[in-house]
Amino acid sequence: MSFIQVTKEEFNTHAQQVSERSFMQTEEMAKLLEKRGFSISYVAWKEGNQIEVSAIVYSMPMTGGLRMEVNCGPIHSSVAHLSDFYQCLKDYAKANGALELVIKPYDTYQIFDSNGEPISSEQKQLISQLTDLGYSFDGLQTGYPGGEPDWHYVKELSGIEEKDLIKSFSKKGKPLVKKAKTFGIKLKKLKRDELSIFKEITSATSDRREYSDKSLDYYQDFYDAFGDNADFMVATLNFQDYFDHLESNQAKLRARIVKLQADLETNPKSEKKQNQLRELSSQFETFDVRKGEATAFIDKYGQEDIVLAGSLFVYTPQ
C-alpha cells in the first residue's frame, strides 16, 4: 500500500472505473489548467497493483511557496483508504513546498428536494474525516465562493426517454416549457470565434449575481481543451418569428372561440361553455398584449436573432 505519483494514462484507467466524477477531474481539465499556467500532477493511493483513490492536483505559486488544490476530488473506487490518501496528500504538499493545500471533495453532504427541504441526513463524517487529520473546514457556503457554487441542482435522467422528459417536470415547469415552445426560440452551438457572445452573457450574469467571471481567453482555452466533450450553447429569439408564432397561435385560438360562440347560440345556458369562452377570450387578449410587445422589439432589433441565454454543457462518461 502506498501513495504515489502516477501517469496520466494510469489516472485515466482508474477514472473509467469510478461511478461518479466531475469534469474537474479529467484529462481535459488538466490540459486546460496547464495552459492557464498551473503545474499539474496525478497522485494516487495503491493497494497492491490496484489504484483505489486518485486525483489531479494543481499548483500555482503564491508568496513564499505554492498553493495546491484538488478540485472536485479525489475520485475513488474504494473508500477504505481515503483517510490514508488525505494524510499522505498533506505530506506530499509539504514536501513540494505548498503553503496552502485546498481540497474540495466531490461528495454529497446532504440531499434536498426542489422546495429546499432536506430528504437525507447530513453526512458529517465527510467533514470529520478531514478535520480529524488537521484540515480546516470553511463551513457550508452559499452563493459562488471562489467563483463556483457548492450547491448543485441535479436531475436524475435514468430511465427517462426523450418523449417522456417533459412529463417528469414539476407542475410549474411543464407550463413554462409549453409557453416557451410558442416563442420560436432556437438553440445554437457556438463556434470558437463566436465565444465572445458567451462571454457577454457570463459578464452580465456575474455582475448580477456578484461573482468573479472568467476571461474570454479562458473560455477559448476551455473550448480547445475539451473539444467534442463540451458545447457552448445559446438560446436565440427572432422577434419577427416570435410575432409570426403569436399570430398563428392566436388564429387557432380565434377558431376555437368562434366555435364556442356558435355552440352558445344553440345552447346559451351552458355554463361550461360560457366559462370556456371567458377563459379563451382572456387568452386572446393576452396574445394582443404580447404582439404589441413583439412589435416594439421588431422596431428595435428588426430581423436580428437576439441571444436570450447561454450555458456550457460538459460531458463525462459518468
Predicted regions located by residue number:
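Acyl-donor binding region in acyl/amide transferases
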Residues: 64-145, 304-309, 318
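A conserved beta-strand-loop-helix scaffold within acyl/acetyltransferase catalytic domains
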Residues: 3-64, 135-146, 156-318
